[in-house]
Amino acid sequence: MTHKRHALLSAIMAVAVALSSFSAQADTDILNVSYDPTRELYKDYNAVFASYWKKQTGESLNIKASHGGSGKQARAVIDGLEADVVTLALAYDVDAIAQRGLIAPNWIKRLPDNSAPYTSTIVFLVRKGNPKNIKDWNDLGKPGVEIITPNPKTSGGARWNFLAAWGYALKQPGGNEQKARELVTNIYRNVKVLDSGARGSTTTFVERGLGDVLIAWENEAYLSVKELGPDKFDIVTPSISILAEPSVAVVDKVVDKRGTRKVSTAYLEYLYSPIGQEIAARHYYRPRNKEVAARYANQFAKVKLFTIDQVFGGWEKAQKAYFADGGIFDQIIARK
């Protein structure tokens, strides 16, 4: 009897140890809700970070990703999509989530560079040989030019596009709000398709063959040329463009509920590491790290950049004036 009890106890202990071991090795899942054209970036980054995390902690990590227009993605998180982290196109979309109590109000100061680990800008992708002779923003407003750009109501990239054109007009000799409005009105008069996100617009231009010019994230333009060949497209960098600063944040309410704060924070912090910066640069994002940026300097065209704070007084003011219901974008589209 004693022998049987001992055997049973040994068996129970063995099962307990096995279960404990299984629990220690069980996968942790986190969800990164991101904007449209970061699919390739985060596919590579997620694999590298998961390997790093496994070596550091012994914990297996399963990183899931959701992509779409930045404004649309922010609304999905507000409406209940349980993102552990968000990596969105602009600070305003993260602020919108924070205003609902899901992210701490001071999120922008929790990571370096205002929680924007890489930057980009806005350029033009044109058909090979540039048949419409597109050189700068003013050319986009000329008759006979068909433009593809996403919808600022749903896409973060589209908002950067709109403000880049507006800022260009303001910075011309004699530039003012009226002249900016005239140029941007003429540009949107030429828009053939307003997709919901930047990747959708790339598909419309590249795969469906619509339009003469795609107003695009710089990284998206370079990716298109890389994947489809320099014999099909040219990249035109305007004389002036906007410094686009995609923002990242831990979704506090979700990570505290799921117990994933430590890994989610590390996931975003690793974007600033030399390895994270290298991955960003390989995917045509402009890295913050000066050493990595120097290695990739020849990859990017020289362009004069202005910031949203310098020209528009920040995202809150810009969103209200240009993209809120009844704002300047709505007024321009209504007259199209």
Where are these regions (language model features)?
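Extracellular/periplasmic juxtamembrane helices and adjacent flexible linkers that interface
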Residues: 255-336
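Short beta-strand->loop
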Residues: 33-35, 126-128, 146-173, 187-191, ...
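N-terminal segment of the mature folded domain
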Residues: 27-155, 297, 332-333
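Ligand-binding pocket segment of bilobal, Venus flytrap-like solute-binding proteins
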Residues: 172-239
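Short helix-loop capping/hinge motifs at secondary-structure junctions, enriched
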Residues: 129-135, 154, 167-175, 254-261
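A bilobed periplasmic-binding-protein/Venus flytrap-type ligand-binding module shared by bacterial periplasmic
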Residues: 122-130, 245-262, 279-283
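Bacterial N-terminal signal peptides that target proteins for export
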Residues: 1-12
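Bacterial N-terminal signal peptides
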Residues: 10-20
